[in-house]
């Protein structure tokens, strides 16, 4: 850190370009899985991306916690960057909702101008979707409690509630997997099937990423990397998790409940 120079000059890192290629391979293998039902490459590339992210997080933890590179100035810019990232993710979901409303309010003649399309047996919103809603809302409450207990220096309860939040996120992912496996329609079944699996699947991916984000926070909390004054990583993870919660409420309302 140079004198009178508030920015952290990051050393050369291979992780951004490597992670970019790994994400590209993951997306390509996902398309292959959709068309050929071969999921092995997608799973391997996804695991590879997770491992690269862990290595990148390791470097960031070393720079912030042990080298003291993240000053208040840097911390504020990181928070602003997280806000921009969440807004960019919001644009993705706005595009999905736009497609959904465009197709449902003015159905195409190719689907007999009816919505939902005929022969589409959709899910009962009072079963797994409602349970998932309770799970995510509860997880938002537990992660807020975890942050509160961290602020008042009660690490034991903070870790307990954070672990409960992660378990709720994993439970949500398991239930969504069960829901997909029992679906009576697939991605190729009209515009409704495409929108449904794209929107809910993209949200499910965010839940998985958020769970990993919180798991890293739990690891750091167990290693006493956080204090009641310095817990930016955990705070950003909470922002992301609440964003995922709110998006699910909109998905449940419009795609499940008001269909």
UniProtKB/Swiss-Prot annotation:
Parts of the chain that traverse the membrane: 15-35, 37-57, 80-100, 132-152, 160-180, 195-215, 238-258
PROSITE patterns per the UniProt record, alphabetical: COX3
EC number: 7.1.1.9
Keyword match Protein biosynthesis: no
Any Pfam family the entry gives: COX3
Topological type in the membrane: Multi-pass membrane protein
UniProt record, GO biological process: mitochondrial electron transport, cytochrome c to oxygen
Catalytic activity: 4 Fe(II)-[cytochrome c] + O2 + 8 H(+)(in) = 4 Fe(III)-[cytochrome c] + 2 H2O + 4 H(+)(out)
Main location: mitochondrion
Subcellular location: Mitochondrion inner membrane
Assembly mode: Component of the cytochrome c oxidase (complex IV, CIV), a multisubunit enzyme composed of a catalytic core of 3 subunits and several supernumerary subunits. The complex exists as a monomer or a dimer and forms supercomplexes (SCs) in the inner mitochondrial membrane with ubiquinol-cytochrome c oxidoreductase (cytochrome b-c1 complex, complex III, CIII).
Family statement drawn from the similarity comment of this UniProt entry: Belongs to the cytochrome c oxidase subunit 3 family.
Entry function: Component of the cytochrome c oxidase, the last enzyme in the mitochondrial electron transport chain which drives oxidative phosphorylation. The respiratory chain contains 3 multisubunit complexes succinate dehydrogenase (complex II, CII), ubiquinol-cytochrome c oxidoreductase (cytochrome b-c1 complex, complex III, CIII) and cytochrome c oxidase (complex IV, CIV), that cooperate to transfer electrons derived from NADH and succinate to molecular oxygen, creating an electrochemical gradient over the inner membrane that drives transmembrane transport and the ATP synthase.
Official protein name in the record: Cytochrome c oxidase subunit 3
Organism: Apis mellifera ligustica
Gene symbol of the encoding locus: COIII
